[in-house]
Amino acid sequence: METYLTIILGILLSEVLRRCCLVLLHAFTGPLSKVPGPFLSKFTKLPWAMELVKGTHLNTVGPLFEKYNTEILRIAPDTVLVADSPSIHKIIVTDDLPKDPIFTKFRSHKKVFLNGFSPRYLDGLEPLMQGCYDQFEKVLESRCAEGGGYAVIDMANTLSNLAFDVMCATSLGGSFNLTTSNDLTLKKSLGLALKLASLQSQVPILKYVPFVADYLVSDMNNMVEDIITRRRSETGEVPRDLLQLILDANIEDPVFFSEQRIREELKMLIVAGSETTSMAVTQTLLLLVNNPEKLKSLVREIDTSFPSPNDEITFSKTQDLKYLNAVIYEALRLSVHPTVMMRYTDKPTILSGYEIPPKTTVQPWAGTAMTDPKIWPDAIQFVPERWLGEYKGAVAEKKHFYSFSGGSRNCIGQQFAWREMRLILGRLVHKYEVSLIPGQSHERRSHTTTRFLQGFYNVGVKPREGF
């Protein structure tokens, strides 16, 4: 018996030693061995996984690129981050590398949603959007009246509520009126869902402990179930919105588009269609109130285009406002940096001067590329004028702009987001003075979408005289 035990232990020890040797060989002699990065990243993805779970990677990666004086980083044995714009363009446009395998279950959803994001369809959503913005303005009016003509508004959460209502009103069967109720229950559940998703992506076994997810995000799950049940119980003609497109896809192919897939897609829509847009608008306001001269230029353009307080601000009237568009582009460049553009090499390729082998996850790091001083003069400064013409010898080129990803896999909802951002900002600065509340933290955390570490961002709001 002891002999058999000795043999088994010997086999196990040999296997452990074999695997250790393979790890060492891959770390020091493999194709990625010359790519700069933290020492531990040669052997394990654990340090990077911890950053993702904590949501701090948004803040720590930039300094790592500076520390190693490189435009490519090895942050796990088979994963690299790429920060130079030509290589990013090669990854997502020229070579159009396939998505990382972890996104396999989300394949083909673009085809389902295509009609739901066509320009004609989006134009038809304007009355629903405007109705939500009317409620937003009523909230501001009420708060200012309570404060004697001035109010401090938590724009991070208020705009999050607004974007949530817009998404539900236009795409999911009806608004939940969070803008007026300020009920944080669903938003807290959504935040927990995003954190849980980050944790599950690094500790996959948690996906098989269903009671954990059900307990933490029960409010979110109940909301999705309510949306589905309500629509399926309707009789007569139903709206041809995104919800119906998803349900129709399930009817056409219940195997590929299963009941579980319906729920996953709805949750994805809620996140992508509300949290990303609201944070983009909040960041734009943050930059404007911290740069009052730029804010004055925007107000001047809005006043010129809409001289009367009764002028209606619409999709068509805002799409060609040059300074408004420049403000949004610049705010997105500085603060909206997608961190889920992972691609996968299916053959050897050269990125940032290094040979990258097949079966490597390559992740474009847009934040560093969009603040590269070689491309963007005064790279970390808020300069909307760079989008209006030459600035300090350089012209802003949209091929270096990645806030909506790029190539064949760019963000399908970007035109929805552009319409929403233009209307919110246009209507807000048309009727209200917005001002800086000093002493606030700008530090953020990221779990799929970003949020302020302090949990809020306050802006002073005051009705404009004559408006």
Task: Kindly give the residue locations of the regions a language model identified.
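Conserved, non-catalytic sequence blocks in retroelement Pol enzymes and Pol-derived host proteins
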Residues: 32-36, 53-55, 119-123, 233-236, ...
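Cytochrome P450 I-helix active-site segment
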Residues: 40, 130, 149, 185-189, ...
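Cytochrome P450 heme-binding "Cys pocket" and the immediately downstream C-terminal segment
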Residues: 176, 292-294, 414-452
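Cytochrome P450 heme-thiolate monooxygenase catalytic core
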Residues: 99-108, 124-281
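C-terminal helix/juxtamembrane-tail motif
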Residues: 1-4, 452-467
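N-terminal membrane-proximal hinge/A-helix region immediately C-terminal to the signal-anchor transmembrane segment
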Residues: 2-108, 123, 127-142, 162, ...
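Conserved cytochrome P450 K-helix/beta-meander segment immediately N-terminal to the heme-binding cysteine loop
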Residues: 364-392
